[in-house]
Amino acid sequence: MSFNNTDIAAFKDVWVFCEQRQGKLMPTDFELISEGRKLADELGVDLCGLLLGENVEGLAKELGGYGADKIYVCDHPLLKNYTTDGYTAAICQVIEELKPEVMLFGASNIGRDLGPRCAARLHTGLCADCTHLDVDMPIYKDFLREASTLAPEKIDGMNSAMVLGEKHDVSRDLKMTRPAFGGHLMATIICPRFRPAMATV
């Protein structure tokens, strides 16, 4: 069976790649778990960590104490030290099987190497060096009426599906914000047609 990354409804959960070096977690792991927790709570899904290495079960327990709902571990002697090909193959195999909706990598040397390779292999999008992450979630017209500077008749005409007090379905897309044009502009990027949406942070 081939991997279908366009069946958006088949994907769920927010995942964080947890980087370890010589049996020690990196400080960015905890920052990513914190950011992933916010996204997972907003989406109403689990936050999962993905840890690769050899004899890293103890690190998995440590990560669980920082807010991850689940930790997936790929434990093998060949994963003891980082290699681009080995880690890419292992991560892509797990993603193809378990289908996370969002996948976050740290903006470290390893994350910047690994994230784009996984995205290319899985034929999905990745936004590098994000400074802010958010989720495009259902909104309510009554909230718009209170918070918007638009006239009420403009709100009423925005979308026939937006009935007062009822949800308006939107995409649940990960909104990834990053500097563009030499830092003179902040661009928000989405990956609307493929999953998982990937980012380095």
Report residues per predicted region.
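N-terminal glycine-rich FAD/FM-binding segment characteristic of electron-transfer flavoproteins
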Residues: M1-V201
